[in-house]
Amino acid sequence: MHEFRAHQLNHFDLPGRIQRLGELAYNLWWTWTPSAEALFSRIDSTAWDQSGHNPILFLRGVENDRLQAAAQNLDYVDLYDRLCSAFGSYLKAGDTWFKRNYPDFENQPIAYFSSEFGLHETLPMYAGGLGILAGDHLKESSDLGIPLVAMGFIYTHGYFSQHISEDGWQDSHRFSLKFEDLPVMPLLDENGEPMTVSVELPGRILHARLWEIHVGRVPLYLLDSNVDSNNEADRALTARLYSADMDLRIAQEMLLGIGGVRALRMLGYNPVVWHMNEGHSAFLGLEQARELVQAGQSLDAAYEKVKAHSIFTTHTPVPAGNDEFPLWLVDRYFSNFWSELGLDQEGFIDLAGREHPNGQPTFSMPVLALRFSGQANGVSELHGKVARKMWSFLWPEIKEEDIKISYITNGVHTSTWLARRMGSLYTKYLGKEWRDHLDNQAMWERVLEIPDEELWRVRRHLKRKMVAFIRERARRQWIHHGVHPVQVIASGVMLDPYALTIGFARRFATYKRANLILRDLDRLIDLLNRPTRPVQIIFAGKAHPSDEPGKMLIQEVYRAVKKAENGGRLAFLEDYDIHLARYMVQGVDVWLNTPRRPMEASGTSGQKAALNGAINFSVLDGWWREGYNGSNGWAIGEDRDYDNPDLQDQADAESLYDSLENQIIPLYYQERSSDGLPGEWIGRMKESMRTISPRYNMHRMVKDYVERLYLPALNSKPILHEFKPVSPELLR
């Protein structure tokens, strides 16, 4: 495994007996290790909550007498010793899955680039599922012992904080992160000065300093352009995610791709595999080719070498969702770069140029990534098919089904998303070592042995816990923000911990159709308010600040939530983040997902919910098209695509209401057995857990990346061909 380059100074005033709390605070291992959070919360639970579960702020601010009391508490010290021992063993482990199976490659670095990483609520460096997946990928790579090193950005303002106004409009509040208050460490040179990397921009040099996060055994390096030597505009390059400003965006992606390669070189890494998580980092292929050409290799040889060791994962099933830059902008930013590749302007543009029937030609980042990758993949079976069709123009001589864009279906990091009580139940019935065998189907068959009453008891506890959390959240809004009483009700203060509860939480993009269930609002209200069979629905999610249709969708949903006829059975929870997501995926009974097929590349929130005993109710798109077996959840609509979106919406809405009214609600409220248990519901819950948990976890997913993509790239020998950019005619 890699050595960390930044070493945290223990600047906390801690009793000697519990001195290693400072070390634990600076490694995110504690965030996914059972009982590790208790090392902080048991010192002072109120202060822990007030810190936002930030161990750096907590240890800096907690009263000294609380620390002294913990250091003298025998039970606490026993827990501390056990977890410190486990942490030390984890970091030094020589017997990892990767080392056992592939010992020849344990010192061959794999570089993983992503524009966002969702690791914990204290690090708001993510906008949605792409970042959460990247964060889970790092955690599982650490668990499996993959020699991964990651590169991304640390954003000065993080992602925005969301507030919903009385009329339902999303207000975006920016805040500045204080990096010294986060579990991130600056990289310093031998003189104690910040290490920086530079990238040439038009008429100036962009500088970025480097930070490091310890994700278990995996180092994550983060680029930060907010340094004094940059002009004001360049200092803002890493201020926030996904700017709509094209000038800023191309400079940002140059920093990630080109600057990221240079940063790894400066730190002494020589990755053998380069993995691009989406196209934002595709310039890394150009930088590696430039290095090789400047070292004396031909462009042909450089291109083949870079391609042989590069992997591109695409997550976007629609062309409009991919980054493309106008040619004049590329000309402006790369006019001094292409000569270092031995290319002229036309040859450089042909690397990734695209013609558009009714518009100006562009420079496509996914095209660049595909051309410089020996292997590419989508993130579900259906998405792989969609991606092969979308990018088939790049390989006109190959049949669509033979195009080498494979798929690896997404999964989730089990220990991050699993409720503690559910984890204890798994330990009791699956075995003490169950977390080491997450992809073992035979082990998961033991779910059927869990007594119904024990499983139901845990499920009821998790829902009560979620409802209590939501109510307390609403109470704080009332006290601290003076919101209108109707907004307090809309925030979930009237939720019933014993009613059938449906969750819908995700980024509010229009294709995700959060309003599909509201299409016939009168019918829905009737279903919600039947006295003996109450139903409640909890919505949560953010729209990108520049996504006006997404914000209008939130407003439509919020206005429906506020209607008095709902009786408080609809709720919208503002400021959705990882912390709220954990409560929801652990607490709801049914997880609803309504994307317009085939636009959901994969999705993972339903996988998290299934792990905790919720049952999926979803359109047959993304991962659910593979996961659904007819008895482990419910499908919305048919396994088909529509040419007419209005017909699709109508058909899917009718299917949704029909299943809800005639299958889901009756099954939950069926006549209970003498012990008060809904036996058939629990049976479907167990079938969901048994079939989904072993397949749709990050343990299986990262192993798939290793065996199907990383190892072939590690073993790859470049085959020299004459370098021929794609003909512009084929890019139209």
For each predicted feature, which ranges?
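Catalytic cores of carbohydrate-active enzymes across secretory and cytosolic contexts
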Residues: 1-732
